[in-house]
C-alpha cells in the first residue's frame, strides 16, 4: 500500500507540472502571437512605419502605445 501511495503522489506531481507548463505555454503563445505577426518589430519600427503611412503617432496629446500603433498599421494595410 505505501508504494502505491508513493506512485500516486508522483503521478500527482506530474499532473501539477502539466497545467503549469500549458499555462506558461499559453503566456508564451500570447507573446509570440504579436511578434510573429510583426516579425519582432520594435516600437521605433512601428513609429517609422506609422510615419511613412501617414498615421498620426499622437492622440489626445499623448503618444500611442505599441499595440495601438499595431492596430492602426494593420488597418491601413
From Swiss-Prot:
Any Gene Ontology CC annotation: virion component
Subcellular location, record wording: Virion
Polar residues compositional bias, start-end: 1-12
Domain of life: Viruses
Coiled coil (UniProt feature): none
Biased composition (Low complexity): 17-27
Induction pattern: Expressed in the early phase of the viral replicative cycle.
GO MF term (any one): DNA binding
Keywords from the UniProt entry: DNA-binding, Virion
Signal peptide as annotated in the record: none
Major place of residence: virion
Annotated spans, Disordered: 1-38
Family listed: Belongs to the asfivirus P10 family.
Entry function: May play a role in genome packaging through direct interaction with viral DNA. Binds to ssDNA and dsDNA with the same apparent affinity in vitro.
Name recorded for this polypeptide: Structural DNA-binding protein p10
Organism expressing this protein natively: African swine fever virus (isolate Pig/Kenya/KEN-50/1950)
